[in-house]
UniProtKB/Swiss-Prot annotation:
Keyword match Nucleotide-binding: yes
Pfam family, one: GCH_III
GO molecular function: GTP binding; GTP cyclohydrolase IIa activity
Lineage: superkingdom: Archaea
Taxonomic source organism: Pyrobaculum calidifontis (strain DSM 21063 / JCM 11548 / VA1)
Entry keywords, A to Z: GTP-binding, Hydrolase, Nucleotide-binding
Protein name: GTP cyclohydrolase III
Length: 221
């Protein structure tokens, strides 16, 4: 089983509205701090976190003790202007674990499987068409992956640039993803007991594909 934590900021919208109309620069500064704190404290326990919205985040927490997750959330609270809540779900896929959040927080003892994906030759495309073109392509890919992941049981997350992370149920799902996205991609896949270790392996696999000029999927266990 896979295990996913969902972190939410209670009353965040009301807090933003309390700042008045000249507020966006304050909101963006706070959100940057929240993003930094989320990554610092969750990766320090071996989890893989990411914001879905800045008032909510998900984290793959396979094989991470609940006590450590609680400590990470407690540290995140110090960066938040509002109360922080979380729940944990388990399921046969990361997506199903996300959907079951709060219902049954089992052990989540499956090995974590993560992908690190990027577009092929995005630097050339950016030079030719500008960064907005690539950004819109990535948004299109994320949208396509959102629908595909509902069937495969994965969760796709935008990392910035032309990089996407995908929480996978198993390595073979990466091959279908690579086939179905609308542009050529490289997909590094990592498998490990702890999620962040799996993502480090995925990045190593992606770096190998990049350095060897290979398009496709590489799995590192």
């Amino acid at each position: 089983m896979h295990r996913v934590a969902v972190v939410t900021l209670r009353g965040y919208r009301e807090w933003t509205e309390s700042l008045g109309p000249r507020r966006e620069h304050i909101i963006q500064r706070v959100q940057a701090g929240l993003h930094m704190a989320l990554w610092r404290h969750f990766t320090s326990i071996g989890a893989f976190p990411h914001h879905t919205r800045y008032d909510a985040a998900v984290a793959l927490v396979n094989n991470i003790p609940t006590t450590l997750i609680e400590k990470a959330v407690d540290k995140l609270k110090k960066a938040s202007p509002v109360p922080v809540e979380y729940c944990i779900g388990t399921g046969p896929t990361p997506y199903e674990a996300y959907l079951s959040c709060g219902e049954a927080a089992g052990d989540g003892d499956n090995y974590a499987v993560l992908a690190h994906m990027d577009m092929v030759d995005s630097t050339h495309v950016t030079r030719a068409n500008g960064p907005l073109h690539v950004y819109l392509q990535i948004l299109h890919i994320i949208s396509d992956l959102g629908d595909l992941c509902k069937r495969l049981g994965c969760i796709a997350l935008y990392l910035g640039g032309d990089n996407v992370a995908v929480l996978l149920p198993e390595p073979k799902a990466a091959y279908e993803i690579a086939e179905r996205v609308p542009v050529p991609v490289r997909v590094g896949v990592g498998v490990a007991k702890r999620p962040y270790t799996a993502f480090v392996k995925a990045t190593k696999a992606l770096d190998y594909l990049r350095s060897h000029g290979v398009v496709g999927v590489k799995v590192l266990k």
